[in-house]
């Protein structure tokens, strides 16, 4: 069709019992948009939820040892949660990918451990960190239908032959990788979907930032993909303030800034953004 649709789902941020309303919203969104891929952009797991109390880690660098029994229990709880919010995708045969936010790790599991668990579920296309420099994500058949990373059709049926493939670009950081989207003839990349692990917390306070390795990976991507990319990450960029306009606190649609910007209220700057944008 020449079209490729991405559905982004952010901040599910639930414990082991995912809200029925959340699952219903995911189902309705999938049916309304019929995406080719879904990207979960962080904070899928509310690591601070009481269910994870025995393995809770407030900051990644906390040195207190967590008993293996608690971690093992948490792994099962995480599997239970993931199974609930990815079930609508599995039943519809929609592939998906995830990156991480500032609360996922607080359950006590590292992003690498979470990545391993996510890959157990049907439809997940997260690559092993620093995997093969070139890895198949989609195989384009003569009829144009895609074959997913694990060799199954999008509907979960058996493997079939393919006529070409697109490369996946993994990195050393779990949750950071690139998915090139090819044209209908599978001859060239026309778009890159880039997931970035944007960090969680900084030692000096406040939120963290992407690692130097992640930034180096991103810097090399334009030449490797050869097409413009869309980037998906959890943490908003400070540069977002460059497309906002300060207004009075009682102005229509005004939103309060954060931390050093907390004394100012903003709306989208119409001269720097496209029509139809939303700040909220």
Residue map of PLM features:
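N-terminal active-site segment of His-dependent metallophosphoesterases
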Residues: 1-84
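Active-site-proximal beta-strand elements of phosphoester/diester hydrolases
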Residues: 3-13, 190-200, 232
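Active-site neighborhood of phospho(di)ester-bond hydrolases with catalytic His/Asp-centered motifs
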Residues: 7-10, 38-43, 96-102, 231-233, ...
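Active-site environment of divalent metal-dependent phosphoester hydrolases
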Residues: 15-16, 46-49, 98-110, 201-204, ...
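Short, glycine/charged-enriched secondary-structure capping and boundary segments
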Residues: 22-23, 53-56, 111-115, 245-247
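Short, solvent-exposed beta-strand-terminating loops
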Residues: 30, 37, 45-53, 232-257
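Extended active-site neighborhood of metal-dependent phosphoesterases/phosphodiesterases
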Residues: 61-228, 248-260, 265
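Beta-propeller domains
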Residues: 229, 233-244, 258-280
